[in-house]
């Protein structure tokens, strides 16, 4: 199939079957495309939609985002995971507002220079917003191309990725680039899916290598799995006499960077001594909760929560910028890791149940 025939087939399929009413497709703007593309990294469309709507309602344009606090941005990202995406979004918003007066540049290289934006995201911004002829290569497109051509090897390898970029460039038409970009993404997301590709309705089925060989599930090849290490940590859920819970902001780098979390300890051993030394608190009562399992891309984490009631707390030179007392029934405008948010909700529900007895 010629490149022209390939793109025409995908475009004709899109006219009848493509997704045209996603939130970021309504009143399209570079800002909306950018936010949606960042959210869609590592996250499915169905999960992203409510987060995107809520985020855009609060931050309707790049200037509003740039003028907000990082804490609030992380708060609206809570639950999506991969929080470096939100931090980079915030950094880039400030750059665009300050250096470009709130307007996205039309240069691919300039957009790629922004934090968290690679070639595919930059291409999506330019093609979907301005109909510029730049290819994209997200996970959906990689899957379509590797299956269609029977490309062996993990797509994350530079050699394989370069080959895929060459094909993406070859098939991206100079006209109707915007429609083709959305079409090839939709084809991968809704037809050429990872687990159950629906080859019978695919516009490329007659000339697809994987379909012809019956090897759809062999492509794209997966990265060789390494053993994922396991880690343990203790979360101290410290409650004062007012029923407030102590949260501590994590360092900007590392896991859950910049988010607010329960104070963390390596072990429950001598935890009373460590809490008194660090925070000046005397412990009235403590109770261990059932461990919580949480998985990151590169390790499994077992969280062991301990609910600790504080008898008194001394006046101490605290850094109030990184320590906050919050009530579990409130919804603070802070970025919270999903397990922390879940534990706060559970704690509030437990308190309500006790009061209603």
Please give the residue ranges for each predicted region.
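Intrinsically disordered, low-complexity, charged terminal extensions of DNA damage-control enzymes
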Residues: 1-20, 25-26, 189-357
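Catalytic cores of DNA base-excision repair glycosylases
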Residues: 4, 9, 13-198, 204-213, ...
């Amino acid at each position: 199939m010629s490149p022209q025939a390939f793109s025409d087939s995908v475009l004709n399929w899109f006219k009848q079957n493509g997704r045209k009413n996603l939130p970021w497709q309504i009143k399209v703007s570079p800002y909306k495309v950018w936010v949606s593309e960042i959210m869609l990294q590592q996250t499915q469309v169905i999960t992203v939609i409510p987060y995107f709507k809520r985020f855009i309602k609060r931050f309707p344009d790049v200037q509003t985002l740039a003028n907000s606090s990082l804490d609030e941005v992380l708060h609206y990202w809570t639950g999506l995971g991969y929080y470096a995406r939100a931090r980079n979004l915030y950094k880039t918003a400030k750059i665009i507002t300050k250096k470009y007066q709130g307007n996205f540049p039309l240069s691919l290289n300039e957009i790629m220079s922004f934090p968290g934006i690679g070639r595919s995201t930059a291409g999506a911004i330019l093609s979907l917003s301005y109909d510029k002829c730049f290819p994209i290569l997200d996970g959906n497109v990689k899957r379509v191309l590797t299956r269609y051509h029977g490309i062996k090897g993990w797509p994350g390898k530079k050699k394989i990725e370069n080959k895929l970029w060459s094909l993406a460039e070859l098939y991206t038409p100079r006209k109707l680039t915007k429609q083709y970009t959305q079409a090839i993404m939709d084809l991968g997301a809704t037809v050429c899916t990872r687990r159950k590709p629906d080859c019978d309705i695919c516009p490329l089925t007659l000339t697809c290598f994987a379909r012809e060989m019956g090897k759809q599930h062999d492509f794209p090849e997966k990265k060789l799995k390494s053993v994922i290490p396991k880690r343990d940590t203790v979360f101290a859920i410290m409650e004062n006499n007012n029923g407030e819970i102590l949260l501590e902001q994590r360092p900007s780098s590392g896991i859950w960077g910049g988010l607010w979390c329960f104070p963390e300890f390596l072990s429950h051993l001598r935890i009373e001594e460590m809490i008194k030394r660090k925070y000046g608190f005397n412990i009235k009562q403590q109770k261990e909760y059932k461990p919580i399992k949480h998985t990151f891309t590169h390790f499994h984490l077992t969280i062991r929560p301990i609910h600790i009631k504080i008898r008194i707390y001394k006046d101490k030179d605290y850094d109030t910028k990184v320590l906050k007392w919050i009530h579990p029934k409130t919804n603070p405008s802070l970025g919270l890791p999903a397990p922390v948010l879940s534990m706060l909700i559970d704690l509030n529900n437990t308190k309500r149940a006790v009061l209603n007895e």
